[in-house]
Design a protein with these regions (language model features):
Chain B
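Structured beta-strand/loop patches that form or line metal/cofactor-binding pockets in enzymes
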Residues: 22-55
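Short, surface-exposed loop/turn motifs that are enriched in glycine and acidic residues
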Residues: 2, 33, 61-65
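Active-site- and interface-proximal helix/loop "cap" or "latch" segments in soluble metabolic
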Residues: 38, 48-112
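Short hydrophobic/aromatic-rich motifs at helix boundaries and adjacent loops
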Residues: 3, 15-18, 44-47, 66-69
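C-terminal binding/interaction regions
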Residues: 2-27, 31-32, 82-167
Length: 407, 167
């Protein structure tokens, strides 16, 4: 199999320019972040932070200072509210399973939206086996939560609600505060979790203002290293660990703390927040250039998700009608443009993105969808190159589709 | 919901870039479609069949992934010049998969769909003619059944979507 991939890579030889836009699924880690991490592998703080020697105490100091910084960026009250986990998936698992198991005496009902990230959907599926039931609140055609249905769904048995701050696929900024008020009004005991991974570093976010009980953030979603994230747990909220092992500074995640990754996550956060307005404006400007350019150059295209200030500034999700998404990602890759598709042409039962289906997109629209996210490192030239390449790529795939595949 | 790596072969990539016999055939004797856009996986086949029941030309259009395009392209090449009987008997999804240098297992169905579409076209030819040869089985073959099953799934999915919309 790896031989096949070598041939695929060889087919990319001679690419003039590369533009990486698949920042939903993985990102570059900028040099500044890597440089900040490197000393922590072999020069300092490489010890176990719970042990009584200099490298251990250095690690302890580093981790506490990192928690402090991230707690500030999130608007948390104290650094102890920050719990590092190996990523967004793990933080969401900890939030949902931990909160549900620890508080099951308060009820066994969970409320989420139809468009929560895959890991949230999967955890609620698993929790069914433990007697928890989940209500999925529908969203409208732009991905906004139906607050009436939310109100109906919450009752005295509801132990937990989980609503992402920003949808990772279509960029919808949810009215989290209103949703939380509705939930708490019906049941003050219900814990409210939000996956804020796609909001952190992109929109103003303050967990104390939002009054959420739990919030997930992820390093790689802000150009930090993969393999690290954090779960904010408001002081006084009861959540137990979900994995067993040796506990150190992170009371809810056993195992030896990964200090270099924590440093990388913190550095990436600093870079995102240092010049927050400028970063965000840059992302928005390039994203708008990208979307406007596509609509100018191509017909039969649809933007998925809302327009304007209710959309996160980095997200572009466009359906190219009469164009199959996976084929388009390969065609673009051969031209040095890297994107992902909401098409799921990889299983017998080919279900496209659950988010696009939830907002009422036809299957053919979902199969032709491409997700892109701009970052502060993209340039005008990157987007110009993308716009040069996209029309011929789409037209070639549409040429293969011809008269077939129109529903 | 999970993702799988898709290490396509050089042959799949080559055929994706330069598919053979692509496009609608205006003078086709028979056309057949398999799959459904709801699945993101659909092929149209066009066959030009002469009086001796030899396939003179074959072409395709594909709403599908690289594997779908590559296998469809291979099938058009394979059936060209064959009698309907040997196209029916000798073109199997396994041969098609071998011809593209193998496929990731989750993409086997693309080859199956391509062969299913050709078999449908052949069946349709005899239906139009009003007589079937003795070698043509009444019962659907594996590939035809698979195509049908995929279409049924698509229908179920679409129904579910409509129900969701009405909610």
């Amino acid at each position: 199999m790896v031989e096949n991939v070598k041939a695929l890579l060889k087919a990319h030889a001679g690419i003039a320019r590369e533009v990486y836009l698949d920042n939903e699924n993985s990102t570059i880690v900028p040099k500044d972040v890597v440089d900040a991490m490197l000393p922590y592998y072999s020069q300092r703080a490489y010890g176990n932070p719970t042990l009584t020697h200099k490298p251990g105490w250095e690690a302890f100091e580093t981790i506490m200072e990192s928690s402090q910084k991230i707690s500030k960026f999130l608007g948390a009250k104290i650094l102890e509210e920050i719990n590092f986990t190996p990523g967004e998936t793990e933080a969401n698992n900890l939030a949902l399973m931990g909160a549900a198991f620890t508080n099951k005496h308060k009820g066994k009902k969970i409320v989420i939206s139809e468009i929560e990230p895959i890991n949230v959907l999967h955890v609620t599926d698993l929790l069914q086996k433990f007697g928890f039931t989940t209500t999925k609140i529908p969203v409208d055609r732009e991905g906004f939560l139906n607050l009436e249905k939310l109100k109906e769904a919450v009752d005295k048995e509801t132990v937990l609600a989980s609503i992402a701050t920003v949808n990772n696929e279509i960029g919808t900024i949810q009215p989290v505060k209103e949703a939380l008020d509705i939930v708490k009004d019906k049941n003050p005991e219900t814990l409210f979790h939000t996956d804020a991974s796609d909001a952190y570093g992109r929109i103003p976010l303050n967990v104390q203002d939002l009054k959420v009980d739990l919030a997930t953030v992820s390093s790689y979603k802000i150009l930090g290293p993969r393999g690290i994230g954090a779960l904010y747990i408001k002081e006084g909220v009861n959540v137990d660990k979900i994995l067993e092992g040796q506990i150190g500074t992170q009371k809810l995640w056993p195992g030896v703390e990964n200090t270099p990754l924590i440093v990388g996550f913190t550095k990436a956060s600093e870079l995102a927040f240092e010049d927050f307005e400028a970063n965000v404006n840059h992302m928005r400007k390039l994203r708008d250039k990208l979307v406007d350019g596509v609509f100018e150059k191509l017909s039969d295209v649809k933007l998925n998700g809302p327009k304007g200030d209710k959309r996160v500034p980095d997200n572009a999700n466009i359906s190219f009608l009469r164009c199959e998404g996976e084929a388009l990602t390969i065609e673009l890759s051969l031209k040095g443009v890297y994107v992902s598709s909401g098409s799921a042409c990889s299983r017998r039962l080919l279900q496209p993105s659950h988010v696009l289906v939830a907002i009422g997109r036809k299957f053919s629209e979902a199969h032709g969808s491409i997700l892109m996210k701009t970052t502060r490192y993209h340039t005008e030239e990157d987007i110009t190159y993308f716009l040069e390449v996209i029309p011929s790529a789409v037209e070639r795939i549409r040429g293969i589709v011809g008269s077939t595949g129109i529903d | 919901m999970s993702r799988v790596p898709l290490p396509y072969t050089q042959k799949v990539l080559d055929l994706f870039r330069n598919p053979k016999n692509l496009g609608k055939m205006e003078d086709a004797t028979v056309t057949a479609v398999a799959g459904n856009p709801a699945c993101g996986d659909m092929i149209s086949f066009y066959l030009k069949i002469n009086d001796q029941e030899i396939i003179e030309k074959a072409s395709f259009e594909s709403y599908g992934c690289a594997a779908n395009i590559a296998t469809a392209s291979v099938v058009t090449e394979m059936v060209k010049g064959l009698s309907l009987e040997s196209a029916w008997k000798d073109v199997t999804w396994k041969k098609v998969t071998e011809e593209v240098g193998g496929l990731p297992s989750v993409k086997f169905h693309c080859g199956v769909l391509a062969v299913g579409a050709v078999k449908r076209a052949i069946r349709k030819y005899y239906e139009q003619k009003g007589s079937a040869p003795s070698w043509l089985p009444q019962e659907l073959t594996f590939e035809e059944k698979q195509a049908l099953e995929e279409e049924e799934l698509a229908k179920t999915l679409s129904k579910r979507l409509k129900v969701a919309e009405e909610k």
